[in-house]
Structures are given as C-alpha cells and as structure tokens.
Amino acid sequence: MTPELERAVKKYTQWFASHRKSGELIKVQVWLTVNHGCIEFLTADDSFKVKRIRRNPRAICYIGAKDGPAVPGTAEVVMGRDAILRVYRAYWKTHPFVMAIIALAIKGRIKNHRQVLIRVSPDQPNPLADMTDPAV
C-alpha cells in the first residue's frame, strides 16, 4: 500500500463512483471501512447507489477525497445483519460525533431491513489486501 493511500484510508471517507444507464460516472461521498481488503459502507436499500450497482457492479472508490487514490473494483449489495452491524459499530469508532446525531435513524433502518451494506472487492492486485480498519 502506498503512503498516500494509507493516509487517505485514515480519513474514513471516500467518493464512491458508479455508472448510470447512460454510462456516466456518478460520484457520491460516503464513509468507509475496510474489512479484509474490501471497502464497505452503509446506505439505504432504495438509494440510487444500490440501483446502479444492481444494474452494473463495476465501481471506483476515490479514497479520502474526490480526486484521491482510485481503487476500482466490483461492488455487491450485502443484506446480512451481522455485516451491517459490524460496519455500524465501526462508524461509531470513526465518526462518533455525527453518529450521536444519526445513529437512531440508521438503527431504525437496520431493524426494519431498510439498510444495506455495499462491499467493493478491489481489482487485483488489491492495494488493501488483508487490511481491516477500523478493527471492531
């Protein structure tokens, strides 16, 4: 992993880019966690991110900033409660002040099965191989 990428990961934020039907690349800022080399984040199950991923799983994660290090990969929607709760707990470690405000809304969506996890498996060679951050 390059020093630039390592610094960017510690910001725990990314610009997630996925493709519209037209092929246009859409970037959206989201938080991130890294789990065994895969980039993960939470979103609502009816978000446009989810709809675009289901149509075309190819994605690019710009780590740390809109023009940060690009990590291309394949995204998938994960609905497993344990994985979602792991990322929820990681968010408390990385963004505690914001989570104090939005935690109830996220927890409610998890309880009502309206929250999903997006997992991006980076292309090989994986620059985040075997990395987990933050550890929960």
Show which residues each predicted segment covers.
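Short beta-strand segments
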Residues: 11-45, 59-62, 70-72
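Short, structured beta-strand-loop surface elements
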Residues: 46-126, 131
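Covalent nucleotidyltransferase core used to form phosphodiester bonds in nucleic acids
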Residues: 4-5, 39-43, 47-51
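Glutamate identity and glutamate-enriched acidic tracts
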Residues: 4-6, 24, 40, 76, ...
